[in-house]
A protein has these predicted regions:
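Conserved polar/disulfide-associated segments of primarily extracytoplasmic proteins
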Residues: 64-162
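Extracytoplasmic/periplasmic, Sec-exported soluble proteins
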Residues: 38, 49, 53, 95, ...
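Surface-exposed amphipathic alpha-helical segments
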Residues: 61, 151-180
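N-terminal "mature-domain start" segment
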Residues: 31-69
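Hydrophobic membrane-insertion alpha-helices, especially the h-region
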Residues: 5-20
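Hydrophobic single-pass membrane-insertion segments
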Residues: 19-28
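N-terminal hydrophobic targeting signals that begin at the initiator methionine
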Residues: 1-2
Length: 180
C-alpha cells in the first residue's frame, strides 16, 4: 500500500512539473506570441478583381469588412486582447495629378511621417499614428504608395509600438509589393 501511494505521489509530481514547464508558452506576451506565429505561418494571397492586384497576408489574419471600403479595397486583421494589427490595401485617384515627389511630401505631412523612402514609382512612409487632437498614440503605421497613371495603390500596416519586431515579415512583404 505504501508503495502504491508513493507511486501515485510521484506521478502527481511529474504531472505538475510537466504542466508548469509547458505552461510557460501561455505566459508569453502577445507580441512574443505574434512574432512566433509570424515565423511559422504561411502567407495567403488575395487577388482584387477590380484592379487586378494581389496582396499577401498571414493565414491566421481574418479578412474583415469595413463599411467605408470602396472598390479595390481589402482589409485583413489580427485581434487578441487589446492588440490589433491591420493590413489594408486601397486604391485612390490621383485627382491632382501629383508627381511622386509632390505626393510623398503631401502624404508625409498629412500622416506625420517620421521616415520616408522614395523608389522608382513608389514611396514608403512610416511613423506614429496621431489622435484627432494631434497627440501621438502608441500605434505605428507603415505604408507603401505605388503610382500607376492616375491612381495610387496603397498598402498599409497599423500595429502597436510593442509589436515592431513582430511585424517585420509583414513590413518586408509591403516593401516587396509590386502592383503588377
Amino acid at each position: 500500500m505504501k508503495r502504491f501511494l508513493f507511486i501515485i505521489m510521484l506521478v502527481f509530481i511529474v504531472v505538475m512539473i510537466w504542466v508548469s514547464v509547458h505552461d510557460k508558452e501561455d505566459n508569453q506576451s502577445i507580441p512574443e506570441k505574434f512574432e512566433k506565429a509570424m515565423r511559422l505561418t504561411r502567407m495567403e494571397t488575395y487577388h482584387d478583381d477590380d484592379y487586378d492586384y494581389t496582396v499577401r497576408y498571414p493565414s491566421f489574419f481574418e479578412q474583415t469588412d469595413d463599411s467605408l471600403m470602396a472598390k479595390g479595397c481589402c482589409r485583413f486583421s489580427f485581434w487578441q486582447d487589446s492588440t490589433e494589427i491591420v493590413q489594408s490595401t486601397f486604391v485612390e485617384q490621383n485627382a491632382d495629378s501629383l508627381t511622386l515627389e509632390q505626393a510623398m511630401t503631401k502624404y508625409a505631412s498629412e500622416l506625420y511621417a517620421t521616415q520616408q523612402q522614395k523608389g522608382d514609382s513608389s514611396f514608403i512612409l512610416s511613423g506614429h499614428i496621431h489622435a484627432d487632437d494631434g497627440r501621438m498614440t502608441s500605434r505605428r503605421y507603415y505604408a507603401k504608395f505605388v503610382q500607376h497613371r492616375k491612381l495610387w495603390f496603397v498598402q498599409s500596416l497599423t500595429y502597436p509600438e510593442d509589436c515592431e519586431k513582430a511585424v517585420q515579415r509583414l513590413i518586408q512583404e509591403i516593401n516587396d509589393w509590386k502592383v503588377w
